[in-house]
């Protein structure tokens, strides 16, 4: 594997983790939001990022890319709040499935992964510079 492949792989990982951090930020920002669909109001549905292998040519290894962004399948919460204008006839309001604790943990994980790939890039750059200085 060439050093340039290392740069491509680490760069793709940074890009993918950056997208994941953006989705997490959107989830947290919209945790209290509602969506109007077909004349009805619904709570915001959390999103999740799905990654997939982005293989190098003629290789079993590669970088990573965002395959898709899907709706989180965790159930919505029902909260008893009969004074809420969005409550049903029994007084329950459907609340978002955004879990701030899980989102924070996922944010820390994605940030650490991003930082680790920055270090990989720094190491690869250092190796390239040392390789270039061999001929001096």
Curated annotation (Swiss-Prot):
Its main location: other. This is Flagellar basal-body rod protein FlgC. Keywords: Bacterial flagellum. InterPro entries: Flag_bb_rod_N, Flagellar_basal_body_rod_CS, Flg_bb/hook_C_dom, FlgC. It comes from Buchnera aphidicola subsp. Schizaphis graminum (strain Sg). NCBIfam families: FlgC (TIGR01395). It is found in: Bacterial flagellum basal body. Belongs to the flagella basal body rod proteins family. Signal peptide: none annotated. The basal body constitutes a major portion of the flagellar organelle and consists of four rings (L,P,S, and M) mounted on a central rod. The rod consists of about 26 subunits of FlgG in the distal portion, and FlgB, FlgC and FlgF are thought to build up the proximal portion of the rod with about 6 subunits each. Pfam families: Flg_bb_rod (PF00460), Flg_bbr_C (PF06429). It comes from the Bacteria.
